[in-house]
Amino acid sequence: MAWENQTFNSDFILLGIFNHSPTHTFLFFLVLAIFSVAFMGNSVMVLLIYLDTQLHTPMYFLLSQLFLMDLMLICSTVPKMAFNYLSGSKSISMAGCATQIFFYVSLLGSECFLLAVMSYDRYIAICHPLRYTNLMRPKICGLMTAFSWILGSMDAIIDAVATFSFSYCGSREIAHFFCDFPSLLILSCNDTSIFEKVLFICCIVMIVFPVAIIIASYARVILAVIHMGSGEGRRKAFTTCSSHLMVVGMYYGAGLFMYIRPTSDRSPMQDKLVSVFYTILTPMLNPLIYSLRNKEVTRALRKVLGKGKCGE
């Protein structure tokens, strides 16, 4: 393999997204602020769901997994970018690059499948409420979540191994702020066209299959909501489902733009901007989308904060 023919001293160079101009310095600290909000928001939501027994339901268990994935996603890219910017070093080892690719791809892939599981959960809750506790019992819910993690990890292993099976004998400057395999393939001195075609097909399958489940689930959900007699029940169902659909739209919209395009149509700046949205903004927005209009979450937060004040 080409991996064996390359030394680990041959680091890659991450060109990053910011220079040291005043404007870019401001944008860098803005990204750090967004990262801090995303880190705190996702951490708080995971802890809140864990601590409050009333949130120990399939829906909130799945949400906790989404927040955990988002938390790991931002931690796999932003800290290295910040370290490189502040230290003036732009290098990343081959092992570090492979690690970033694995975590980044596995977490995105896992979220892809998890969002489909979450839509199925809403379909069962709204269209088959009497069978919900049986169809979404903890064992089944846990298995579906585990499969989401496993499928995402398998995809990441394949992508990472395939990416580093190519030789990189020319420039080692990656036009990105983290290691992403499309940016690496551009640097390869091998013909990567076959791998890119296989990658394209895999991306289509990984996106189309979950999207088909989401569309089918929400088509039934919308029909059920329309025929609901209770105004309160309709409002609650609409609030929950609209939050999920907003996240699905952001996630798959950015994913389609990022990975379905052929390499020849890629612009480094476009990739960077979409990646900032994908890896930083979306993890920040998810806790806000799911919590701002959710009475159960706000109640749990007040309960935890109330206990903290009493403890003081």
Swiss-Prot record:
An MF annotation (GO) of this entry: olfactory receptor activity
InterPro entries in the record: GPCR_Rhodpsn, GPCR_Rhodpsn_7TM, Olfact_rcpt
Disulfide bond positions: C97-C189
GO terms of biological process kind: detection of chemical stimulus involved in sensory perception of smell
Any Pfam family hit: 7tm_4
Gene Ontology CC: one annotated term: plasma membrane
Main location: membrane
Residue ranges, Cytoplasmic side: 50-57, 121-139, 220-236, 293-311
Transmembrane segments: 26-49, 58-79, 101-120, 140-158, 196-219, 237-259, 273-292
Location(s), subcellular: Cell membrane
Keywords attached to this entry: Cell membrane, Disulfide bond, G-protein coupled receptor, Glycoprotein, Membrane, Olfaction, Receptor, Sensory transduction, Transducer, Transmembrane, Transmembrane helix
Glycosylation sites: N5
Effect ascribed to mutating H244N: Found in a renal cell carcinoma sample; somatic mutation
Residues in the Extracellular compartment per record: 1-25, 80-100, 159-195, 260-272
Top-level lineage group: Eukaryota
Membrane topology term: Multi-pass membrane protein
The family this protein is said to belong to: Belongs to the G-protein coupled receptor 1 family.
Main function: Odorant receptor.
Protein's recorded name: Olfactory receptor 2M5
Lineage: Eukaryota, Metazoa, Chordata, Craniata, Vertebrata
Encoding gene (name): OR2M5
